[in-house]
Amino acid sequence: MDKFEISSKFKPSDDQEKAVTNIVDSIRSGNKFNVLLGVTGSGKTFTMANVIKRLNMPTLIMTHNKSLAAQLYSEFKGFFPKNHVEYFISYYDYYQPEAYIPRQDLFIEKDSSINEELERLRLSATANLLEFDDVVVVASVSANYGLGNPAEYKGMVLLLSLGMSLNQKELLLKLVDMGYKRNDAYFDRGDFRVNGDVVDIYPAYFNDEAIRLEFFGDELDAMYHFDVLENKRTKDVSKFILYATSQFIVGENRLKQAIKDIELELEDRLAFYEKENRLVEYQRLKQRVEFDLEMLSSTGSTKGVENYARYLTGQKAGETPYSLFDYFEVSGKDYLVIVDESHVSLPQFRGMYAGDRSRKEVLVEYGFRLPSALDNRPLKLDEFIAKKANYLFVSATPNQYEIDLSQGHVYEQILRPTGLLDPRIEVISSDNQVEVLFDRAKAVIARGERVLVTTLTKKMSEELTRYYQELGIKVKYMHSDIDAVERNELIRGLRKGEFDMLVGINLLREGLDLPEVSLVAVLDADKEGFLRSRTSLIQTMGRAARNVNGTVILFANKITNSMKEAIDTTEARRKYQGDYNKKYGITPRSASRNLEDSLKEEDLPNLYNKAKKLEKMPASERAKIVKELRKQMLEAAKNLEFEKAAALRDEIAKLREL
């Protein structure tokens, strides 16, 4: 079995080593559920990596948003450079699910934009899970959504070996069955091309290399990887396993059976509408499904094919849909599931099923979809935790749910290798809180440090930002309408010192790593609620736990139970770390995180901004520009700069239209 190898100049600290040993021993003893309770800045990610190394199991790491998933993917790629670290999030740049609003008689068509690089990474994850053992997949909630049958996907592979007898015509037909398309003019992922006795295949999950097959009659005479852009031979291989272009590709027999089953359900549903005298729904469903059946028969797919997933995967009504978990389980080996920031992730998993079902029930009721579409759904929480996996829930503030689930197997990690103490906490009257905060913030900013302020309302945030700007503070407001790209720009600007204070309502998300922030202010801290609960307050306080001068001010006229619990927990941890530092002579130091590595600048090339010149340019010259842009697009995607890669992709598409 392949072994996980950690690449790091650090070794686990005493506290990390203790947590790793306890977790590994617990899992090996047969305890399915375990909790790592680790404070902010204690190195939970490094602990997770060491658990993976010692257990030596394929691992799925899940978190609740794409930003954290990207951060974790980058970190684990660094920890395991010799192993297969994969990335599995939604491949949509934009996604609007189909929906129907009965009171307005308004049907909203599904609209989406697929990010080809994210799609490639998803395919790479499933392909490598079937081929290797040393696989870590970092995923968002996408891992809970339906995928094709892994057994069907595995059955669609093409096994190639040097010297084998292989008829070229049969090879090309097999490639078409696997979803590959012939394209001799423009060679892209998911394509193949033929030039005499040479067949080039661009696997859908490869980055910038393809595979070349050279035949001598019906014998596979040579096989090697080559760089697509430069057409250079890079690596000879004697064996190669080619996977299909999608997890939803099915064999001919399965497709024929699926079409028959869909036709039977359609007949049954149409009879229901006819009996109920609902002629509009009757006609609507008949027209939509018959069109889909025609497309499935002729092309093997159709728009919204996922709504027929139950039939295409051969499952029964109500069965748990196939998901990424099944690609781990198909080998029959033990695997590990790590749920990062579990106090947020698990409640989100719980809510996914209900939201998806309520939308689809309306579509089914009004004849836009067959009832079987309800089986194309995310996993329920009880299905999620019933998988044949070992679970590790990771959080600074785990909920009672995961603590109960683990039956006491909760392992703390509350010492920071940097010696940093939890922030000092001050409770100050909320009378004149705006003026008091202004004075405190000015002192912090004068030291070259940053300030985060959390308020309860959008109006308060806007007014506070405007007021402080008038008083000369460089401050910005992070509101709920900004997208992930703008959010990262704001965080980058704060870290670089372009402004000194960031104001928001729920901006202090889990995993936000800002070593420059030394003051966190919570206005109206005594207003009990979701944003002022014990968990939220501890998470908010943690944003000041990466700076040696970290301080939290709670503006309140009374101390609520949530405040008291959060303060008591933080002060106990502060004392524990302080005693440890004193015992071992550790001097606290601020955490460090390389700004350029963590937040890369967008720098789109300016090769294509003069349309008139490009139109007059010879096709061969335009092809050179496309080649250069494609190279930059692949490089951007490799560096996880997906917005930049998407912009380059769009420009390439424009150039090809000229």
UniProtKB/Swiss-Prot annotation:
Occurrences of domain Helicase ATP-binding (ranges): 25-182
Chief localisation class: cytoplasm
Record keywords: ATP-binding, Cytoplasm, DNA damage, DNA excision, DNA repair, Excision nuclease, Helicase, Hydrolase, Nucleotide-binding, SOS response
UniProt cross-references to SMART domains, sorted A to Z: DEXDc, HELICc
GO molecular function: ATP binding; ATP hydrolysis activity; DNA binding; excinuclease ABC activity; helicase activity
UVR domain residues: 623-658
PROSITE patterns, alphabetized: HELICASE_ATP_BIND_1, HELICASE_CTER, UVR
GO cellular component: cytoplasm; excinuclease repair complex
Annotated Helicase C-terminal domain residues: 433-596
Chain location of the short sequence motif Beta-hairpin per the record: 91-114
InterPro entries recorded: Helicase/UvrB_N, Helicase_ATP-bd, Helicase_C-like, P-loop_NTPase, UVR_dom, UVR_dom_sf, UvrB, UvrB_inter
GO biological process: nucleotide-excision repair; SOS response
One family name in Pfam for this protein: UVR
Function: The UvrABC repair system catalyzes the recognition and processing of DNA lesions. A damage recognition complex composed of 2 UvrA and 2 UvrB subunits scans DNA for abnormalities. Upon binding of the UvrA(2)B(2) complex to a putative damaged site, the DNA wraps around one UvrB monomer. DNA wrap is dependent on ATP binding by UvrB and probably causes local melting of the DNA helix, facilitating insertion of UvrB beta-hairpin between the DNA strands. Then UvrB probes one DNA strand for the presence of a lesion.
NCBIfam families: PRK05298.1, uvrb
Family as reported in the entry's similarity comment: Belongs to the UvrB family.
Protein name, entry field: UvrABC system protein B
Species, as recorded: Campylobacter fetus subsp. fetus (strain 82-40)
